[in-house]
Every structure is written in structure tokens, then in C-alpha cells.
Amino acid sequence: LLVFDEETLRTMCRQFVGEFTSRYSNSFVAYASKAFLNQAIARLVAEEGLGLDVVSGGELAVAKAAGVPMDKLYFHGNNKSPEELEFAVESGIGRVVVDSFHEMGLLSDIARARGVIQDVMIRLSPNVDPHTHAHTTTGILDSKFGFSIETGDAARAIRRALDAPNLDLVGIHFHLGSPIFELEPYSIAIDTV
């Protein structure tokens, strides 16, 4: 049995949205579904103005069943199956965060077959050590996540996305790892990106 205090969750959501939008008016806060997701949580965060960050077809299905607007979803993950990408495009997902050239090709083919233009973001690997546990470090050169800036893959991925007629490159993304207790790795990564 899991018990959540709804008012506390709503207050936290409002605080996150309020803090970000008060400083950056064009901010968009997304709840990381991997933390915990069921239909009630999905509805609650959507009602409070947050989007959802989903990493699987299952999380996407929960969000869809909960009535979360699909344009408020970001689909992350470095191992999306063709079926999950098809489901995402078919569902009208807001953005797919692309992690590999293979995924970009699959997504482009699916969007073309459906006659849609899919918004995408490119996940970059800035090769920054966040000084955390090796198993949770995701933004270094040999990471399995994203396109390396240092090797030129990031520039090639951006060019390929811009050239794909059924993909609309709307942004870039990076993640360094967790937990991170220092600001310096973020500052270095932002300068690198």
C-alpha cells in the first residue's frame, strides 16, 4: 500500500512551476514518471500544469489512459523499441528525445508513414564528470546515452534531424547523472553545449 498526501504533492508541483516560470517565463516543468506513476499521479501533475517525462510504452499508456494531454509528454530513453515509437507517434506525443542515429531513422520512417511531422529533441553528451557514482553518471564520453559533442556525433545528429522532412528539431537536451551536489558540472556542461 502506498499512501500519498495529495495536498503536499500539489503544493510541490505549484512551487516548482512557480519558481521556474517566475525566473524563466518560457519554462516547462515535467514530472519524471520513473519516480512513480499511476493514473492518479499522472492526472494530478497534469492538473497542476506539469508535463510528463516518460521512458516506456507502459508509462505512455498510463499517461494516455489518465487523459494527460499528449503534447505535454516527452519520450526519453536510449532503448525505445519500434513499437514504442509507433505508439508514441500514433498517440500524438509532444516530443521524442532522440538518443541514437538508429532511433532517429526509425522515428523519421514512422512519422513519414503516418504523414506527420514529429517534434524531436537531441540528447547530447557533453563529456562532463558530475562527481557522482560511476553507475549513475550519464553525460561522459563513453556513456550509452546521447550524442557525443566531442566526437562530432552531436553536430551530425543535429544536421540529420534538421534535414529530415518528417522531424522538427525543437531543442537539445542533456543529463549528467544523479545525484549531483555541485553546480560546477552544470555550468561546465552548459558552456560546452
Over which residues does each language-model region extend?
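Active-site loop/helix belt of alpha/beta enzymes
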Residues: 127-193
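A charged N-terminal "starter" segment
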Residues: 1-119, 155, 159, 164-169, ...
